[in-house]
UniProtKB/Swiss-Prot annotation:
Belongs to the NrdI family. It comes from the Bacteria. This is Protein NrdI. Probably involved in ribonucleotide reductase function. GO terms for molecular function: FMN binding.
Length: 132
């Protein structure tokens, strides 16, 4: 399953690169309104006072039907708004919040993310096979 991500300041991009997951796509201003026709896990940062970035909002308006899970980055200095974009997306689109990580994530966060994506993919593939 593809990992789709948005990186406002480069932190999420660095996190994804460190994860060494190869099946990825970056959301940009240029492609945020393009249709995306396959299941994906979304990774996004949080901006302002816990908001979902506009590019991610635009992407989800068109492509929410293929969203399977979300992970979010943030800064703990924002207290209850830490990585709030992930919780907002999870609640709005009824998908699991895989994890929250600070800024570009620690090595432990990267390992946790890879493991969760791997388990999520295994379960998704199993469900897909059982539906045939």
């Amino acid at each position: 399953m593809k990992v789709v991500y948005f990186s406002f300041s480069g932190n999420v991009r660095r996190f994804i690169k460190r994860s060494e997951i190869s099946d990825v796509m970056e959301i940009t201003k240029d492609n945020c309104t393009d249709p995306f026709e396959e299941p994906y896990i979304l990774v996004t940062g949080t901006i302002g006072f816990g908001e979902v970035p506009k590019e991610v909002q635009s992407f989800l308006e068109i492509n929410h039907h293929n969203l399977r899970a979300v992970a979010a980055s943030g800064n703990r200095n924002w207290g209850q708004n830490f990585a709030k974009a992930g919780r907002t997306i999870s609640e709005e689109y009824h998908v699991p919040l895989l994890m929250k990580f600070e800024v570009q994530g620690s090595n432990k966060d990267v390992i946790e993310f890879k493991n969760k994506v791997g388990h999520f993919n295994e379960n998704y593939e199993r469900e897909k096979v059982q539906s045939y």
